[in-house]
Regions:
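Transmembrane alpha-helices and adjacent helix-loop boundaries
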Residues: 1-218
Length: 218
């Protein structure tokens, strides 16, 4: 049994590793998009204009309230009806990026809220504009505070990248499904998939824990 498993694992691993490459592409692409959009939602939520704040809250509540898989289906299957056709990989990145942007927005919001108001008032008394206060004071402090939850969000996104398999993105889970169907070697295939996900997520988990310990000392 162990020998059979190793033989099959050696045969299947190159196929699954191609899926790993796509998983990394989806995760990194969606992560970058989620950071940009999350920062936008967070800044809109701090706007002095009430309509802008309402738009931010509405977007966050709507996106958070709709399952990720439905958002992926909408991007991949519905947007083409409006003339915007995307390939599966792009749809997966956009769908996951939008879905996770609301969590990134909360990370940024918590970071902004952690900034001591006295520091902001001191900066204003020195004649700094609101833009400079945001760029030179609030953003660096907010990012520092948001780093640990940002790491946890990245780990969740890595695992949820498997949902992109539902729109035929050939990431790790999809590659494994096709391999299992064609070979009937379910135990070998899904064991390898689990091991590969752990190999990607555990280093991130350890890095987040290390970062949290360092932040706690400061």
């Amino acid at each position: 049994m162990p020998e059979d498993f190793l033989v099959r694992a050696a045969e299947f691993l190159p196929i699954l590793l191609r899926g790993v490459v796509v998983t990394v592409q989806v995760t990194v692409g969606a992560l970058l998009l989620s950071i940009v959009l999350g920062l936008v939602w967070a800044l809109m939520g701090r706007s002095r204009l009430k309509p802008v704040r309402i738009v931010s809250r509405t977007v966050v509540n709507v996106v958070r309230g709709v399952p990720i898989i439905v958002q992926l289906f909408y991007v991949y299957f519905v947007l083409p009806e409006f003339g915007l056709s995307l390939d599966a990989l792009a749809a997966g990145i956009i769908g996951l990026g939008v879905a996770y942007s609301v969590y990134q927005a909360e990370n940024f919001r918590a970071g902004f809220d952690s900034v001591d108001p006295a520091l902001v008032e001191a900066a204003k008394s020195l004649g700094m504009s609101e833009r400079k206060i945001l760029q030179r004071l609030m953003m660096p402090l907010a990012i520092r505070t948001a780093l640990p939850p940002f790491g946890n969000t990245s780990i969740m996104l890595l695992k949820d990248s498997s949902i992109a398999s539902t729109i035929t993105v050939a990431e790790l889970t999809r590659a494994g499904q096709l391999l299992a169907v064609s070979t009937f070697q379910n135990m070998t295939v899904y064991t390898l998939i689990a091991v590969l996900y752990l190999a990607m997520s555990l280093p991130l988990t350890l890095a987040v824990h290390q970062l949290e310990r360092r932040m706690a000392r400061r």
